[in-house]
Design a protein with these regions (language model features):
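Conserved GNAT acetyl-CoA-binding A-motif
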Residues: 98, 105-117
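Short, surface-exposed alpha-helical segments at coil->helix boundaries
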Residues: 40, 122-125
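Conserved catalytic-core motifs of GNAT/GCN5-like acyltransferases
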Residues: 116-118, 125, 129-149
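Short glycine-rich hinge loops at helix-strand junctions in the catalytic core
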Residues: 92, 109, 132
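Residues forming the Rossmann-fold NAD(P)(H) cofactor-binding site
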Residues: 95
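Active-site acidic-Proline motif in GNAT/NAT acetyltransferases
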Residues: 85-87, 91, 120
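Acetyl-CoA-dependent GNAT
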Residues: 8-11, 16-87, 98-100, 104, ...
Length: 156
């Protein structure tokens, strides 16, 4: 698998992978991604800022991840929108993406990697813990919003 920066013309591929993963989560009862216009605009902006990466096998996009600096702490990178097209899940690709994020953090002089998961998504929380992330507890940014669990990993 190759991990490379997404280019503007790959936005539809990123959105497609996220939509398919969103459908899968909805089938599990996890309402997390909604693929709204805000998602489209946010992802487009993140691609322009070189924060979105594609997971590619044989020239086919099979996943995506966003890795960008935390607005409140420039020494922290935030991992979000980690999505692997369902037929490619359970093949050990997600740990490779997390390893890539860790290498990127080191290269950029970051000392912490952060991520959040919906409280209902036990498998993503387990993946993060298996890869050295520490559960920091739950958060609810605003009333009626999703409750998520924060995870952090110190980079040494």
């Amino acid at each position: 698998m190759e991990i490379r920066l997404a280019e503007k013309h790959k936005l539809i591929e990123v959105l497609y992978v996220i939509r398919e993963c969103s459908r899968q989560l909805l089938e599990k009862g996890i309402k997390y991604w909604n693929n709204s216009l805000a998602d489209y605009n946010d992802i487009s902006e993140d691609i322009a800022n070189q924060f979105v990466y594609l997971l590619v096998i044989d020239r086919v996009t099979i996943g995506t991840v966003t890795i960008k600096p935390d607005k409140s702490n420039p020494k922290t990178l935030v991992i979000s929108r980690l999505a692997i097209y369902p037929p490619y899940q359970k093949r050990g690709l997600a740990p490779q993406v997390l390893s890539f994020a860790e290498d990127l953090a080191r290269k950029n002089g970051s000392t912490i990697l952060k991520g959040t998961t919906p409280i209902e998504d036990k498998s993503l929380g387990q993946l993060l813990e298996e890869n050295g992330f520490i559960n920091q507890g739950s958060e609810n940014e605003a009333p009626d919003e999703f409750i998520s669990i924060k995870f952090e990993k110190r980079i040494v």
